[in-house]
Amino acid sequence: MIGTSRSWRSHASGLAVATFLLVAADPSFAQTAGAQAAPAATPQGAPAPAAGTPAGDEIVVSGIRQSLANALNIKRESAQVLDAISAEDIGKFPDKNVGEALQRVTGVQITRAGGEGSGVAIRGADPALNRVEVNGQTQLSTGAGVSSRAVEFRDIPSEFVSRLEVVKSATADMTEGGLGGTVRVITRRPFDNNGKPFLAGSAQTVYTDLAKRWDPKFALIGSKTFFEDKLGILLSGTYEKRSLWYDQARTTGWRQVDRNQPVMAPACTTDRIGVDENCVDIDRNGFGDFFPDIPRYVINRELTTRYAFNGIVEYRPVDNLKLFVEGTYTRGKQKLNSQFLQLGTVQAATNGGVSLANTTLGEDQTVSHVRFVAAPGTIGTAGGLSATYRNILGTIDRQNINSQVGGDWDVSDRFTVSARGSYAKAKAVNNEINATAAAQGLAFIDVDYSGSSGAPNIVLPIDPTTTQGLTQFIVLRRPRYNNQTEKAGKIDFEYKPESFLTSIRFGVQKRDVDVTSKLYDGTKTYNGYVAGTPGQGNVTLANYATGSSVAQVVSTGSNAAILQQIQNIVQPNFDLGDHNFFNTGSLGFDGYQRFLNLGMDVANAAGVPDPFGNLNPTDTWGVYEKNIAGYVSTAFAFEPAGIKVSGVLGARVINTKTESRGSIVTGTGLAARVSPFSQKGEYTEFLPSVNLKAELIPNKLFARATATEVIARPAPSDLAPRFTLDSVGFTGSRGNPSLQPYRAKQYDFGLEWYISKVNFLSATFFRKDISSFVDRTTQQELINGVNYTITLPVNGTSKVQINGVEVGSQVAFDFLPSILKNTGVTANYTYSKDKGYNQLDYFTGGALTFPGLSRHSVNVSGYYEDSKFSIRMSYNWRSKYLIAALDRGNNPAVGAAFGQWDGSASYNINDHISVFLEGVNLFHAQRTENANSAYRQNIVETYGRRIYGGVRAKL
C-alpha cells in the first residue's frame, strides 16, 4: 500500500514539524450544532439569539473547552440534526479553507484538488448533490469544465465566516436541493460585537514544499455601529497568492488485448465476464488480462491569485424592525501549466501490438510489465507507436457575486414577517491552450508497474529530455465560458400561539436559475509524416514478437521541411524546468524525472489559433430552471409522562419547470447539418418532514428521530443537449434533457449523552432510501466511419438504500494531574453501507458501491491549551469509494482509502496579538485512484506538505 512505502526522510521531516507543533499553540475550534444566525430565518424549534446579543456569544471560541461547552448547549437545544464549526478570531478555523474545515464534521468527507479541500460529500452524497448557502442565499458553482452544481470551497474566504453548519435533517422552510444535506456558511455581522468597534487582521505566509515558494495572504475585517446602535456597517477583504504543484503518474484506463492480431483492442470482444478465443489470457485461467491504456506522467503547476470583498449594512430603526443589505465578491485567477509525457497506446489498436515474450503478468489479471511494439510497416510513420509531450496551458478566471436585501418585522409579540430578495452570479472562463508534440513511428515502448507505488515506469527508445524524433506538433485552443445566475425572492410568516404549538410558519419562494456554457475551438497542426505511409523496411514476425526492431526506418512519406519547422518551433522554446517529478519520496518510482516542457513560448511560436470564429455548437448550451415553492410547518412542545418532547412538522411543495437549449447535428461529413434544439420539462414534488426530540433525562440524555423527503437536481451539463467526442480515446459523452431529479426519503434516530459541561457522547443511526438517481451507461455509435464509445446519463432503475451509524465524542481530561489536565480529544466515526445499487464492474461482474460512499471515515483531534499556548494535531481518514461505475474503457473509477495528518500551534503574546504555525499533510500522504483493483492504478498523486506561519491581531 502507498502508506507503507513512504521514505524515511518524508517521515522524519514530517515528524520534525509535528514535534514543533506540539510545543507551541491555539487551534480554537469546535464542533457544534446551532440555529442559523440573522439575517437568515431561524429554523423552527432552534434557539434564536436574544435581541441585542450577537450570535457569536452563543458559541464563542475564546478557548477550546469553552467553545466545546457552548457547542454542546446549542446542540442540546437544536431541533435539527446538524453539526457546525465556528471561530471567534479571524482565520481561527481548524483548517486552512472552508472545505477542509468541514471534513472534521461527522459524516462529511471531502474531495481535494491539488491537495486542497474543494468539495464536500455528506453521508456519501456527491458534492454536486449538497446545497450550499451563504447567509441563506445559494452559492453557485464556478466550475471551469462542464457545468456542475458543486461549489468551489477554496474561493470562500474563511476569514469572512462566523460559523459553518452542516444540516442533515431538513425542515419545510429550507430551500430544497441537498440530497445529503445543506452546508450553511454564516458570515460575521455588524452587530456581533455588542455595539463596540471591531478591527482584526492577519498576515501570513505559506510554504509549499513541491513548489519551493513562499506565498502571502492578508485579511482585514472591521465593523462599527452608528446612531445609538441603530445602524451597523461591516467591511472585510482578503488577498492571497498560492502556488500549487502536484505530480501525477496516471494510466488513463485498462484494456484487454486481442491475441489474434496481436493488437490492442478497445475492449477485446468480451461482453463482460471471462474471455473468448480472441482475448489474451497469459495464465490461461479463463479471464482476460488487463493492459495499460495511455500511461503518462503529469507535472501540474498552478499559480492562483485570490481576492474577496464583503460588505454588510444593517439598520434597526425601531426595536421590532431589522433591515439589511449585503454583498460579497470573490475572484480567483489561476495560471496553469500541466506538463505531460504520455503514450499513445490507444493507437496500437490498429498500428501496434504487445510483445508477449517481454510481458509479465502480475496480480489480479494485470500485467506488471509490458512491451508495446510497432506493427509491421509502421516504424517511422504517422500511424505507429508514439510518445507525446503535451502541455495544457492558460488561465482560469473564477468570479462569484452574491447580493441580498431583506428584513424582519415583528408585527406583534406573536406575529413576524420576514422577506428576502437576492441575486447571485458565478462566472468561470477557462482560456485553455493545448500544445502537443509527438514522436511517432517508434519501434517499442516499455511500461513497468512492479514498483511499490503502482505508478507506471516508462522506457522509450528516445531521450524525453530532447526534441529527438518529433514529427508532429499541434496547438489547440479551446476556451470555455460558463455562467450561472440565480434570481430569488421569498417571504415567510410566523405565528406563535399560546399552546403546545409553539410556532406556525408558512411562506413562498421563487428562484430562477439560468446556466449557460460556450465552447470555442481553434487548431493548428504540423504533420511531418504523411499519415498511413509505410516505412522503407518490413518488420519480420520474429522481430515483431520480441520487439527487437530498431527505429531506424525513414518514412517515404516524411516532409523534411515540416519536420525542420517543428524543430525550429520547439528547440529554442522548450525547457525542462527546475522541478523533478515525484520528488516527495520515490515510492518505488524510478521513471523519468524530467521531460520536455512545452510552455507558452512554444505555443506562441507555433501561432496560437484564434478560435472565436469556431463556436462548437454541440457543446454550447443553456439550461433554465424556474422553481416556485410553498411550505407550512409547525413547531410543538409537550410533556407526556413527564418527558419533554418537542419537534417540527411540515411539508414543502415545489414546482420546477426546465428548458434545455442547444444544437444537434444530423448527418455526417459534408451532409452534416446543425439545428437548434430545445426541450422543456416540468415536475412537482411534495416533501414532508418531521424532526422530533425527547429529553429522557433532564439536561443529560436526549433522543432524536427524524423522517424527511429530499430532492437534488441533476448537474446542468447532464441536462444539456450537449455532445462531445475524444478522437484520441475514441470516446464521447452526451447530455440528457429528460433526466428526473434525485429523490430520497431520509430517517435518523440518535441518542446524545451530555456527561458534563464539556464531555459528550452521541450515536446516530441514519437511513436514506434513494428512489431516483442519475447513473451512467455506454453505447457504441458509428461517427464518420469510426466506432466511438459514448457515455450518457440516465435515471437509475434500482432502488438504493444507504444505512449508517455516526458516533461522536468529546473528552476533556481535566481530571488528570499536572499539565495533562489541559488536554482533550474530539473524535468521530461514520459507517455507511448501501444495498440495491445494480451497477456492476463491467469486466469482473463484481458489485459496486453507490458513487461517493465510503464505508468508513474517521476524524480524531487531540489538543493542549493553557493561557498562553495551544496546540492541535488532527487525523482524517476515509475508506475507498466509487467515483464512476463506467469510466475510461468501461472500467470503474475508484478513489482509494486516504488519510492525512494536520497540525496547528499558536502563542498569545498578549490579549491582542498572537503568532501561529500550522501544517497541512505533514507526512506527505499520496492520493490514488484505481480501476477497482490496487494493481490497476489510474492516478498516483503527490502534492507535498504546506506550512503556514503568521500573526493575528485585533483591537
Model-found features: residue ranges?
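C-terminal beta-signal and adjacent terminal beta-strands/loops
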Residues: 4, 528, 823, 877-886, ...
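N-terminal periplasmic "start-of-domain" segments of outer-membrane beta-barrel proteins
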Residues: 60-93, 119, 127, 137, ...
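Extracytoplasmic beta-strand/coil segments of soluble accessory domains associated
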Residues: 99-141, 168
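Outer-membrane beta-barrel translocator/receptor signature
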Residues: 145-150, 159-166, 173-272, 301-309, ...
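Outer-membrane beta-barrel transmembrane strands
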Residues: 187, 203-206, 214-225, 293-338, ...
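Flexible glycine-rich, low-complexity coil/linker segments exposed to the extracellular/periplasmic environment
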Residues: 260-292, 354-385, 446-472, 530-619, ...
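Outer-membrane beta-barrel signature, preferentially recognizing the C-terminal barrel domain
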Residues: 398-400, 619, 623-625, 711-770, ...
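Gram-negative outer-membrane beta-barrel transporters
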Residues: 767-769, 781, 786-885, 923
